[in-house]
Amino acid sequence: AADPRLVREGLATLGQHYPALKGLAVAHAWGGLIDSTPDGIPVISAVDTMPGLYLSTGYTGHGFGIGPGAGRLAADLVAGDPPIVDPHPFRYSRMIDGTDLGEPGMM
């Protein structure tokens, strides 16, 4: 659930930066966990050390928009079909093989 104090603080800050929005009411607020990877790129991949296990995760809250393409890539990988896009950037192994993932951060 959203923290009411943080919602109030956010609205107050919004009103400071955009005076026309001062006093704005919020009809609904959401709070929860968002999965992310250190480099902000989803993992859509087999896990080489666990045959038969495939991951599709790390969408940082953007899964709705990229879901159709990500789902197609995941389905292609599981079925052994030619992938719709190059799966290399989405490989799980980049998390454990020393690949430079950049500075950790939030997307």
Question: Model-flagged regions — what are they?
Answer:
Residues 1-52:
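Active-site lid/adjacent beta-loop-alpha segment flanking the redox-cofactor pocket in flavoenzymes
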Residues 48-107:
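C-terminal lid/capping helical subdomain adjacent to the catalytic/cofactor pocket in oxidative enzymes
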